[in-house]
Structure formats: C-alpha cells, structure tokens
C-alpha cells in the first residue's frame, strides 16, 4: 500500500505562537474638581410639612378615620339625593325606594294591561 494522504497534509506542522496578552486601554483622564465653598444663607427655621386634609376644606377640623370619612360622605350624598326637585324628582325617589318585589309586580301588571288592550278580530 502506498502513502496515505490526509486532508490536513497541506497545512504546515509548525504551530504559530500567538501572544494572548490582553491589551490594556488607557483610562481617560478624570477631571477632579474641588467642591466649591458652600454659600451660607441666613438660617431659617425648618419648615414643617402639612397634610392635604389640613387645608381647611374639610367640614370637620378633627382627623377622621377612613371609615368615618366614607360614612360622612355617604350621608352627604344621601341628603343631596333626597332633595328631589319638582314632580319628576319625587317620582324618581318613589321608584328608587320601591323594593324589587313591588317593581316586578308593577311590570307584570303593565304587561297584563297591554295584553288586554289587544283586540283580536
């Protein structure tokens, strides 16, 4: 048998030595500034913050818990709702005050009256 040629036969057998030293990039120059002298102002007393509830818009000067505030707001809404102005406002309040059972009975009586009004020839 003859010589066996390999695929890698065309490559040289010498290994190339590569310098694998990491290149160090020069660091940019950092400008260090000295802090400027602090300007002293006339000292004023420290201000205290205020809560939004203390703006004077509330009817109660005392602080209310969230549940109490919700109750007060619901009472105000209820009073305003009851101020039904005019005939239509009163009718609306009557309808709203009806329980569901009465409301369903009214609807059923209206439907019965409509059926009775239909005349068959």
From Swiss-Prot:
Keywords: Cytoplasm, Lipoprotein, Myristate, Palmitate
Post-translational modification: Myristoylated.
Biological-process GO terms, alphabetical: ERAD pathway
Keyword Transport: no
Subcellular compartments: Cytoplasm, Cytosol
Pfam families documented for this protein: SVIP (PF15811)
One GO cellular component term: cytosol
Main location: cytoplasm
UniProt region (Disordered), positions on chain: 1-121
Superkingdom of this protein's organism: Eukaryota
Covalent lipid adducts (S-palmitoyl cysteine), residues: 8
Residues with lipid group (N-myristoyl glycine): 2
Ranges in coiled-coil conformation: none
Annotated Basic and acidic residues bias: 11-23, 73-83, 90-105, 112-121
Annotated family: To yeast YGL108C.
Protein name: Uncharacterized protein new13
Source species: Schizosaccharomyces pombe (strain 972 / ATCC 24843) (Fission yeast)
Gene name per UniProt: new13
């Amino acid at each position: 048998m003859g010589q066996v040629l390999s695929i890698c036969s065309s490559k040289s057998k010498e290994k190339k030595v590569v310098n694998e030293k990491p290149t160090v990039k020069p660091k940019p120059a950092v400008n260090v500034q000295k802090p400027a002298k602090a300007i002293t102002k006339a000292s004023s007393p420290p201000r205290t913050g205020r809560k939004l509830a203390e703006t004077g818009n509330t009817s109660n000067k005392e602080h209310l818990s969230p549940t109490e505030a919700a109750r007060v707001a619901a009472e105000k809404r209820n009073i305003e709702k009851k101020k039904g102005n005019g005939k239509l406002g009163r009718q609306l309040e009557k309808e709203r005050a009806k329980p569901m059972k009465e409301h369903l009975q009214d609807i059923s009586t209206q439907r019965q009256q409509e059926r009775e009004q239909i005349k068959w020839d």
